[in-house]
């Protein structure tokens, strides 16, 4: 039995190829059934995200194994083998285990240390467990990868610092306000970055979210998801005084929030502080706002500085995380080898039991026929000894004939002679 990991990701393949190799949730069961129908495949898990498609397999070793699996993948997706082959990576046993642990821990992600991948790996495992896993070693490998990912999160700072603009904006808000559960947040825009910000804020249970956008329809869809109120851009001047935090990201060519607007809001708030995070280019907030007392303005450049600092911290944490993965991989492979030995021990014990039962039955039959008990017992002991030492004796003789001192030493050691 061999463990394999093969696939493509954001580092080896462009998005147009990754799109063609993806497995949709609707066709996953069919794909797994087709994969398990291959004679060499014992069990499998398919991980398919926007940044990677990977097959984790337990297989029987055979000639042209790699060719057969690549051919299946290409045939299933209607791809040219050469197009896929140059982007495909292939890991076996130790390397396959290490790769899965790195993936689950976020060490192989586009954004180093991002936590979402662990949930995606768990879902892939759960989906594939519906009748497609079949192999305890494969299941154990995934369960181990989950515990390793948790250990990496617990023992390192790999996920402690923000490395995306959206996450950095939310982290900044949490640093300035002791608790977000008592603040009102005004989000200006409804694009991808604001969507991510809104979801982050929802996870931290902000008291109230208001979304201001040029088109109500797009903002309403996001508002329905995160439980926010929608207003028009023209309403910002009137509603700004309610906001403790303003995060803005639009495509407007001119600033949306001016110095005078913020001055009026601060006056109405009796100078309670306001945090303004402008992640738009061109800027949505007039730079002069940053000169106002109690108005704390951060631009996208400020966030990028935070991100670069945090990314350096994550890279340092990744070194520690890689050490954890190396250690855990070694321990898992030791367990896997022990499983192989356990099966051999079971087979050897079963074989010995069969010999014992066979010879004991013959001895009992001889006793029932009135044979001499002492002779029968001596005959049983002699035959049992000869049968049990026959195979080791042949191996010792063959090692001696071959002049293989190392094998002879191993055999002597295993028989307790050294």
Curated annotation (Swiss-Prot):
Residues of the site described as Important for activity: 99
Keywords: NADP, Oxidoreductase, Porphyrin biosynthesis
InterPro entries, per the entry: 4pyrrol_synth_GluRdtase (IPR000343), 4pyrrol_synth_GluRdtase_dimer (IPR015896), 4pyrrol_synth_GluRdtase_N (IPR015895), GluRdtase_CS (IPR018214), GluRdtase_dimer_dom_sf (IPR036453), GluRdtase_N_sf (IPR036343), NAD(P)-bd_dom_sf (IPR036291), Shikm_DH/Glu-tRNA_Rdtase (IPR006151)
Leading EC class: oxidoreductase
Biological processes, Gene Ontology terms: protoporphyrinogen IX biosynthetic process from glutamate
GO molecular function, one term: NADP binding
NADP among keywords: yes
Pathway: Porphyrin-containing compound metabolism; protoporphyrin-IX biosynthesis; 5-aminolevulinate from L-glutamyl-tRNA(Glu): step 1/2
Binding site for substrate: 49-52, 109, 114-116, 120
Reaction catalysis annotation: (S)-4-amino-5-oxopentanoate + tRNA(Glu) + NADP(+) = L-glutamyl-tRNA(Glu) + NADPH + H(+)
Listed EC numbers: 1.2.1.70
Coiled coil: none
Active site: 50 (nucleophile)
The keyword rRNA processing is annotated on this UniProt entry: no
Domain of life: Bacteria
Residues annotated to bind NADP(+): 189-194
The family this protein is said to belong to: Belongs to the glutamyl-tRNA reductase family.
UniProt subunit comment: Homodimer.
Free-text comment on this protein's domains from its UniProt entry: Possesses an unusual extended V-shaped dimeric structure with each monomer consisting of three distinct domains arranged along a curved 'spinal' alpha-helix. The N-terminal catalytic domain specifically recognizes the glutamate moiety of the substrate. The second domain is the NADPH-binding domain, and the third C-terminal domain is responsible for dimerization.
Note: During catalysis, the active site Cys acts as a nucleophile attacking the alpha-carbonyl group of tRNA-bound glutamate with the formation of a thioester intermediate between enzyme and glutamate, and the concomitant release of tRNA(Glu). The thioester intermediate is finally reduced by direct hydride transfer from NADPH, to form the product GSA.
Role, per record: Catalyzes the NADPH-dependent reduction of glutamyl-tRNA(Glu) to glutamate 1-semialdehyde (GSA).
NCBIfam families attached to this UniProt entry: hemA
Name of this chain's protein: Glutamyl-tRNA reductase
Organism taxonomic ancestry: Bacteria, Pseudomonadati, Pseudomonadota, Gammaproteobacteria, Enterobacterales
